[in-house]
Amino acid sequence: MFHGTVTEELTSHEEWSHYNENIREGQKDFVFVKFNGLHLKSMENLQSCISLRVCIFSNNFITDIHPLQSCIKLIKLDLHGNQIKSLPNTKFWNGLKNLKLLYLHDNGFAKLKNICVLSACPTLIALTMFDCPVSLKKGYRHVLVNSIWPLKALDHHVISDEEIIQNWHLPERFKACNHRLFFNFCPALRKGTTYEEEINNIKHITSKINAILAHNSPVLIVQRWIRGFLVRKNLSPVFFHKKKQQEKIIRGYEAKWIYITKGYEDKLLKDLFFKPETNIKGKLAYWKHNIYYPVDLKNSSEHRKHVSSILCELKPKDLGMKSKTSRHLIQKGQESEDEIVDEKLDTSFRISVFKLPIYTSGSLKNNAVLREKKQHFFPAYPQPIYTTHPKPIIKKDIRLERSMKEFFAPQRAGMKLRTFSDIDKYYTEQKKQEYHKEKVRVVAMAQVARERVRVAVNEHLNQKKYATQKLIEENKETIQNSLRQVWQNRFNYLEKARERKALFLKEKSQKASERLLVQNLNNERTLLTRGLLKIDRLEKNEAVLKEKSLIVKQKLKAEKYRKNLLKEMKKVRSQEIYKRHCEEKFVMDMIAFEKACERLQDAKTKVAIVKTNLDFKVPNGLIK
């Protein structure tokens, strides 16, 4: 509708005012939310998601789950790997009536009392609490299993009957936490999962838990056996009763009618009752899954009533004078021309028996018309071909004829009764003619009634056609008016859109010119500023250079002064060292002279002593 960049003027338009409200309204339709490992701390945004069914908030920093109170349609809730330390009260869990799977493992729960509030959850099937501090407490599993009644699985194991029923010691197969009861219903999360996949996963987990319980729960196994026994016990009289009733019906109709079975149920019953050696369970299972009704039963019964109303008038009033010759056999594949009004089909076991109508010569002439009517009211549908057992052709009982001939024989008591026989034949023929006339009259009445019905049907069809055409014309006119209104609204909308677009483009061009002027001024100001900055930079550089040169000169002067000072200090130091050296040399010489004097004196003393010693010790004879 708008072209160009979205600006503040567009976002403040009245058509954009409900944008945020629409977003909030759209959150009500969310059914699947998955925020895994996003370091979230709050769930406040889920308060408006009232249609949420699957919620995955694992591996975050969630501490409060009260915002989920409005999500009453939750089926699966995954909160593992968070920092939850306490659960809401029973009112919160009582509102989650559809919650089946709850994942709370790897959290900070520490008290069993706080966990017991989950007993208010009415449909909770599977729960995980492992890797929590509370799972290390003694009796943790016993308390949870006996507090949450609908619970079927807890922490990778399905709940056994030994954990529920007190003081019941079972074999190893049915004990708690057996390997047969192991089921990991919290697999690792996969990326890109959809809502349908999550729902299918929930169904798979539920069915798997039920299957494990069905095969490893003694209570359920015994219940299944008892139900099977009761069902077989209740159904056995039905089978025996139906078999006896079938035999009675067969014996009763062996001398009267040949019945035709229609429908898949009758074929099944015929196989069950006539062939006892067949597989009854297989037949029942096949009938259960493959039963087929090609036409609506109620509609078929209503259609048959129209035909039966015409055929009922073809029957003679005196039922006692029905001719046995009108009863004929129906071969395989042949269908009766008209049928008696059908009763509503019952889904229970029964044998369908249809009586054959009686026809006269007049009624058989209109066979094609009746067949067309039958095809109109009973459309042809593909039906399975049923096997009919051939029946022996019933022969006419001629005992009465034989007795009449014997009575009218001339040998009877020597009396000729030929005249009476002729009179009796005359009256018989007269009755037959009257009976035939009555039948012709009934057929004529039926034809008149059929013609009347045909005219009424045609009138009804014409009225329906006229009403339909009138309704179609009215609908066309309404559609045309609606289309004109739609086109007019669209034209008005386009005009308003064009006006708004022109106004928007005008404002846009004006703002573009203003923006260009501002840009030119900014460019000139920028150039001036750059020149001033360049001059300031040059002046600063010159000042810096002068300062640096001055510093260098001062450093050179200081260096020269330092060198001269070092030279003078070296000279003074050398003089002092020389003077000290001379003094030390004089002192050393004096010390050496004193030592030499002392040595000389010692030597003189020793010499004197030696001399004195020699004077006393030398014998006189040795002295010259």
Swiss-Prot record:
Residues 553-614 form a coiled coil. The lineage of its organism: Eukaryota, Metazoa, Chordata, Craniata, Vertebrata. Residues 132-179 form the LRRCT domain. Residues 215-244 form the IQ domain. The gene is LRRIQ3. This is Leucine-rich repeat and IQ domain-containing protein 3. InterPro entries: Leu-rich_rpt, LRR-IQ_domain_protein, LRR_dom_sf. Keywords: Coiled coil, Leucine-rich repeat, Repeat. It comes from the Eukaryota. It comes from Homo sapiens. LRR repeats lie at residues 51-72, 73-94, 98-119. PROSITE patterns: IQ, LRR.
